[in-house]
Amino acid sequence: MALLNVLIYPDERLKTVAEPVSVFDEELQTFIDNMFETMYHEEGIGLAATQVNVHKRIITIDIEGTKENQIVLINPKILESFGETGIEEGCLSLPGLRGFVPRKETVKVKAQNRQGEEFMLDADGLLAICIQHEIDHLNGIVFADHLSPLKRQRMKEKLLKLQKQIAKNR
């Protein structure tokens, strides 16, 4: 397995809308394994393929971080959503930054698993929030896009400053 490079906001490639997956081969299985490895290494609970510059509709999730309840959603679609909730969200593509994003409390998702078989998933709480966050990535949206223009600009400035510090220390 290999670690993948996570794109950092405001990288324009994060705005790319992902294409559906149609081939479920060994290469896809390896890529999904690498997504999980990257997600755990970066201490995240979810990762969308677009965040690692692969513009396919693939999401990996493990909200407990135990590796025992891994979820793979390929070509996910939210069919129903109910209730209102929201938390201060973070994101591997916006390291160290958080912002409140309103979300639906419960979602019903249709997706495919690693083998291409369709399934339905009812999710609520943190899992529902994570699914919505990652599907946003597949649609070229980062959580900062849900924030006010002023907050979004401040986030960009903080990240650019951080990137300059990292480059300076290399």
Swiss-Prot record:
Species assigned in the record: Histophilus somni (strain 2336)
Protein family membership: Belongs to the polypeptide deformylase family.
Active site, per annotation: E134
SUPFAM superfamilies: Peptide deformylase (SSF56420)
Keywords: Hydrolase, Iron, Metal-binding, Protein biosynthesis
Keyword Transport: no
Name under which the protein is recorded: Peptide deformylase
Enzyme class per UniProt: hydrolase
A Gene Ontology BP annotation from the UniProt entry: co-translational protein modification
